[in-house]
Design a protein with these regions (language model features):
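Structured beta-strand/loop patches that form or line metal/cofactor-binding pockets in enzymes
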Residues: 42-71
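Adenosine-phosphate binding glycine-rich loop
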Residues: 2-24, 220, 336-452
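Rossmann-like adenosine-cofactor binding region
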Residues: 264-366, 371
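Glycine/serine-rich phosphate-binding loop and adjoining beta1-alpha1 elements at the start
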Residues: 96, 115-229
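Glycine-rich phosphate/diphosphate-binding loop of Rossmann-like nucleotide-binding domains
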Residues: 193-196, 201-314
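General beta-strand structural signal in soluble alpha/beta enzymes
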Residues: 106, 160-164, 187-192, 258-261, ...
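Conserved active-site and cofactor/substrate-binding residues in soluble primary-metabolism enzymes
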Residues: 2, 16-23, 27, 43, ...
Length: 452
């Protein structure tokens, strides 16, 4: 049994009840086989794979808070600090009923390599809670956030661990969290990113993940002699990532015809109206039924099991921007049958492993979220830089740096894949390229720092 197989067996034995984490580890280690086999003695002697798949620490805590009826509620909070070999732990806080240790570990593990790819000095971590902000009043959200930070503050800091937003954690929640940290510590420091512009936030942070996804997608297509202008796109989701991916796609001359939320999806052959979508989702916080009611060209479809949703339409580019494992093997078959050119992930691991392999085997240009959605964390790191220097850059400055970072990420993952002849379906294996490029930087730092 080789070193990779030995470590995979150990990880599966130790984390048997954590399917999301195991899926992420298996995907990464399988793609790293050529790198590890080329340096197996060195990596095995230094237990590199054992160390990189085991978090530095995982913190789980009780979060009690009082609802509007005076009833005490209790949620579970998490922070997994995975690896800080190249910088402070960095990763979002997810507030969603599905949150558990497995999901937070999978996200933290992925974050290590994603953050490495940004070319910026940030390590990997993730956190969150099974608290559901939907349907809660502002007072209830504040009560939860203050209780959550009353425990979390012990483990974070501007040079230690810098959390950010994620699903369920937007500007409102970040504000409440930052206020409580400042109140407890008496420090005004860049301990969170995604802050409001009046208290240390960065311009272009809101747009960063979606814009970055399109910058990388455009670089990918250009490298293959394809012009994004005139292409038709399917996007899933209707949160920040999806909205600004749609906006940037339109700016680049493409047309996005779908978006979705937890209850259903929109098909709009005239192209999604971004201004209307923003009004429905960012201002009214309403369902997509309101978009359809205000847009004659749009069709609304309620979500039903067994349907392909946004992936059933004939499109050139697919951009999954909703949540993990949303695009399965049947969806992948539908996309391939309809002649999709590329799939680039805006969400974290939205494509199942089986679907990923099918897309790649059928010659689809596929870039996973580790590289494709790194724009968000890259701009968070730029926010950290601005906070450290007590400066505020213009939108154009931040957006220009973001575009450069995403183009560099594409170049690096393409180069890494080619160095190890990583191909699948006759095309460059960008998933392997991302894992290799991210892994090499982290491992070099780990080896330089000794056993720690």
């Amino acid at each position: 049994m080789g070193y990779v197989d030995e470590v995979l067996a150990k990880v599966k034995e130790k984390n048997a009840s954590e399917p999301e984490f195991l899926q992420a580890v298996e995907e990464v280690l399988e793609s790293l086989r050529p790198v590890i086999e080329a340096n197996e003695e060195l990596y095995k002697k230094n237990a590199i794979l054992e160390r990189i798949t085991e978090p530095d620490r995982q913190i789980m805590f009780r979060v009690p808070w009082v609802d509007d009826n005076g009833q005490v509620q209790v949620n579970r909070g998490f922070r997994v600090q995975f690896n800080n070999a190249i910088g402070p732990y960095k990763g979002g806080l997810r507030l969603h009923p599905s949150v558990n240790l497995s999901i937070i570990k999978f996200l933290g593990f992925e974050q290590v390599f994603k953050n490495s790819l940004t070319t910026l000095p940030i390590g990997g971590g993730k956190g969150g809670s099974d608290f559901d902000p939907k349907g809660k009043s502002d007072r209830e959200i504040m009560a939860f956030c203050q209780s959550f930070m009353t425990e979390l503050y012990k483990y974070i800091g501007a040079d230690t661990d810098v959390p950010a937003g994620d699903i369920g954690t937007g500007a409102r929640e970040i504000g409440f969290l930052f206020g409580q940290y400042k109140r407890i510590r008496g420090l005004y420091e860049g301990v969170l990113t995604g802050k409001g512009l009046t208290y240390g936030g960065s311009l272009a942070r809101t747009q960063a993940t979606g814009y970055g996804l399109l910058y990388l997608t455009n670089a990918l297509l250009k490298d293959h002699g394809i012009d994004i202008a005139g292409k038709t796109c399917a996007v899933s989701g209707s949160g920040n990532v999806a909205i600004y991916a749609i906006e940037k796609a339109h700016q680049l001359g493409a047309k996005v015809v779908t978006c979705s939320d937890s209850t259903g999806w929109i098909y709009d052959p005239e192209g999604i109206d971004v201004a209307l979508l923003k009004e429905v989702k960012e201002v009214k916080r309403a369902r997509l039924t309101e978009y359809a009611a205000a847009r004659p060209s749009a069709e609304y479809h309620a979500k039903q099991n067994g349907e392909h949703g946004v992936w059933q339409y004939k499109v050139d580019l697919a951009l999954p921007c909703a949540t993990q494992n949303e695009l399965d093997i049947e969806d992948a078959k539908m996309l391939v049958a309809n002649g999709v050119t590329s799939v680039t992930e805006g969400a974290n691991m939205p494509t199942t492993l089986e679907a990923t392999k099918y897309l790649q085997a059928n010659g689809v240009l596929f870039v996973g979220g580790k590289a494709a959605n790194a724009g968000g964390v890259a701009t968070s790191a730029l926010e950290m830089s601005q906070n450290s220097e007590r400066l505020s850059w213009t939108f154009e400055e931040v957006d220009g740096k973001l575009k450069g970072i995403m183009e560099t990420i594409y170049a690096n993952i393409s180069d890494a894949a080619k160095r190890y002849n990583a191909t699948v379906g006759g095309k460059t294996d960008y998933v392997a390229g991302a894992n290799i490029a991210g892994f090499e930087k982290v491992v070099d730092a780990m080896l330089a720092q000794g056993v720690c």
